Amino acid sequence: MAPGSRGERSSFRSRRGPGVPSPQPDVTMLSRLLKEHQAKQNERKELQEKRRREAITAATCLTEALVDHLNVGVAQAYMNQRKLDHEVKTLQVQAAQFAKQTGQWIGMVENFNQALKEIGDVENWARSIELDMRTIATALEYVYKGQLQSAPS
């Protein structure tokens, strides 16, 4: 069979020509491949480290933004609470003043009511006196008329 035909067992040796060294890995080629591999690994590590730093920076920015956003709400709630506390104190003071004023009004109304009762008592007393005086006046008039009629003229 002819070399290169199908029936022939192919081997690397049989295809080499005389004087060609056997294929052994070239040390410089392996060294170059190793350096390329290490360079690629270093590039990947640097890229990964860069991405990690970017992710940390982005996470930090996000965290700060969220905290700032929450702090705005918390600050607003705190301000609202302070306003409410102030309004409660003001309302308590006003309620106390109103209660005091109401007590004064009640006292004045009671005094006025007592004065009206006293005026009513005085009015009743005056009517009673007036009635007594009329009775006395009528009696005196009756006696006086009786004396005039019985006296000789």
UniProtKB/Swiss-Prot annotation:
Biased composition (Basic and acidic residues): 1-11
Keyword Cytoplasm: yes
One Gene Ontology CC term in the entry: BORC complex
Compartments where located: Mitochondrion intermembrane space; Mitochondrion matrix; Cytoplasm, Cytosol; Lysosome membrane
Known EC number: 2.3.1.-
Gene Ontology MF terms in the entry: protein-lysine-acetyltransferase activity
Underlying gene: BLOC1S1
Keywords carried by this UniProt record: Coiled coil, Cytoplasm, Lysosome, Membrane, Mitochondrion, Transferase
Top-level enzyme category: transferase
Catalyzed reactions: L-lysyl-[protein] + acetyl-CoA = N(6)-acetyl-L-lysyl-[protein] + CoA + H(+)
Cysteines engaged in disulfide bonds, as pairs: none
First-listed, main subcellular location of the protein, grouped into a coarse class: mitochondrion
Coiled coil start-end: 27-59
Name of the protein this chain belongs to: Biogenesis of lysosome-related organelles complex 1 subunit 1
Region (Disordered): 1-27
Quaternary structure note: Component of the biogenesis of lysosome-related organelles complex 1 (BLOC-1) composed of BLOC1S1, BLOC1S2, BLOC1S3, BLOC1S4, BLOC1S5, BLOC1S6, DTNBP1/BLOC1S7 and SNAPIN/BLOC1S8. Octamer composed of one copy each BLOC1S1, BLOC1S2, BLOC1S3, BLOC1S4, BLOC1S5, BLOC1S6, DTNBP1/BLOC1S7 and SNAPIN/BLOC1S8. The BLOC-1 complex associates with the AP-3 protein complex and membrane protein cargos. Component of the BLOC-one-related complex (BORC) which is composed of BLOC1S1, BLOC1S2, BORCS5, BORCS6, BORCS7, BORCS8, KXD1 and SNAPIN.
